[in-house]
Design a protein with these regions (language model features):
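Conserved catalytic alpha/beta core of Sir2/sirtuin-type deacylases, generalized to analogous enzyme cores
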Residues: 2-162
């Protein structure tokens, strides 16, 4: 997550202190974004002082601000989108239904992005949860960036909401 809670949560998951998780779609995806694009993040400790012009500059440079942390769209979101789209299309063509976290589990456990990790994978709570196959409840998936990607791909006919 943008608050780097994954470091302590991953340790608790691996120590069998966590048996299920409920989180927002943003919490789910941000752990993976951080995993592959950490070095490209921008920290803005004085985020309350940003002017509308400052905000526009961040947007123009493809940074999505979450409080004091700016997530790089191209290095994080679009990279993960490509991997998820393949999984969504494959699931739709096979008539398979999955929960949002199951697509991330598949991505993480496949090793497809392992060479792109920019943080210690031991700090990823989602990877720890995938390794334990923990159930995750994700209300509000549609409000997340990847949830919006999924909706747009459905609207444009590239996949369907099986």
């Amino acid at each position: 997550s943008t608050a780097e809670l994954g470091i302590s949560l991953a340790e608790m998951i691996r120590a069998d202190k966590v048996h299920a998780i409920s989180c927002t779609g943003a919490n789910l995806e941000e752990d993976v974004f951080n995993l592959v694009a950490h070095e490209h993040y921008k920290r803005i400790p004085n985020y309350r002082d940003l002017s509308p012009l400052d905000e526009q500059e961040l947007l123009n440079n493809h940074y999505n601000r979450v409080t004091d942390t700016c997530i790089p769209e191209m290095e994080a979101m679009r990279v993960i989108e490509e991997h998820l789209v393949r999984r969504w299309v494959n699931a739709a063509s096979n008539g398979t239904r999955k929960f949002p976290h199951e697509y991330f589990y598949d991505l993480l456990l496949s090793g497809d992005i392992a060479s792109s990790y920019q943080i210690n994978p031991e700090h990823s709570w989602l990877l720890a949860a995938a390794e334990k196959n923990l159930p995750i409840v994700v209300p509000g998936w549609e409000d997340s960036t990847c949830g919006n990607f999924f909706a747009s791909h459905c609207i444009e006919g590239r996949t369907n909401p099986q």
